[in-house]
Regions:
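Glycan-processing catalytic domains of CAZymes
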Residues: 1-176, 180, 188-191
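Surface-exposed, glycine/proline- and aromatic-rich loop segments on solvent-exposed faces
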Residues: 194-202
Length: 202
C-alpha cells in the first residue's frame, strides 16, 4: 500500500492517505483515513492473520490493553474499545473522508490452506468473521452485541459530521387536557413524530 491510495482498514494509529502521496501526508494534506471495529492482525508478530488466530486485534483490543478479552471475557466485546480508540484518533486528524469498516460483512470465509503472514498462519482460517469479539460488523444483531455498535457509530458520526445540540427542556407547564392545543406552544423541546411509523419490534 502507499499513502497515495485510499485505505479500508488499518491498525491504530491508522495510516493517513493523500492524493499527493507521502509528501501530502507530511504537509498535513490528509484526504482519507479508516476506522475499524476490529482488525485481522496479530499484535505480537505485527502481521495479517485470521480472526480465529492468536493475538488478534479484536473488538476489545487497544494498544494499552492488548489482551483485555483474555482477561475480562465476553463482556469486554460489548464496549467497542478498539473502535473508540480508532475513531478518537480520526476525530483528532479530522480528514475530509472516513472509511468505516465494516457493515454487512457477515460471512464466514474459511480458507482450508494456511492463511496469514509468515509467522501468523492459521489452518482452516476464518479470515474476517469468527465470533462476537473477532469480527467487525456494526449492524445490530439479536446476539450478545445487540445494537451497541450501531449506537456507538451514530455517536461518533455525529461528532465527525457535526450535529445540532440536543435541545434542553423548557420550564414545567401545567396542561389542562380539555383546554386546547395552544397551551403547548411554549413547551420545549418541540417534538414531531411521523404518522403511522410505529410498528411492533421483535
Amino acid at each position: 500500500t502507499s499513502a497515495k491510495q485510499w485505505g479500508w482498514l488499518s491498525v491504530f494509529p491508522q495510516a493517513l492517505y493523500s492524493t499527493r502521496g507521502q509528501k501530502g501526508v507530511e504537509k498535513g494534506e490528509i484526504e482519507q483515513m479508516t476506522v475499524g471495529v476490529a482488525v485481522n492482525h496479530n499484535y505480537v508478530t505485527k502481521e495479517i492473520t485470521a480472526m480465529n488466530g492468536v493475538n488478534v486485534m479484536g473488538r476489545s483490543y487497544t494498544t494499552d490493553y492488548e489482551n483485555r478479552y483474555d482477561v475480562e471475557g465476553a463482556e469486554a466485546s460489548k464496549w467497542g474499545y478498539q473502535f473508540s480508540q480508532q475513531f478518537d484518533y480520526a476525530l483528532e486528524v479530522s480528514p475530509p473522508v472516513l472509511f468505516v469498516t465494516g457493515w454487512n460483512e457477515w460471512h464466514a470465509w474459511r480458507q482450508p490452506t494456511p492463511w496469514g503472514g509468515a509467522n501468523s498462519q492459521v489452518n482452516n482460517a476464518l479470515v474476517d468473521q469468527f465470533s462476537d469479539e473477532f469480527s467487525r460488523d456494526l449492524e445490530p444483531t439479536k446476539g450478545a452485541l445487540q445494537d451497541h455498535y450501531y449506537y456507538l457509530f451514530v455517536n461518533y458520526a455525529r461528532k465527525y459530521k457535526g450535529a445540532s445540540p440536543i435541545p434542553t427542556p423548557g420550564e414545567n407547564v401545567t396542561i389542562d387536557m380539555t383546554a386546547g392545543t395552544d397551551q403547548w406552544k411554549t413547551v420545549e423541546p418541540y417534538y414531531a413524530a411521523y404518522i403511522g411509523n410505529t410498528f411492533d419490534r421483535d
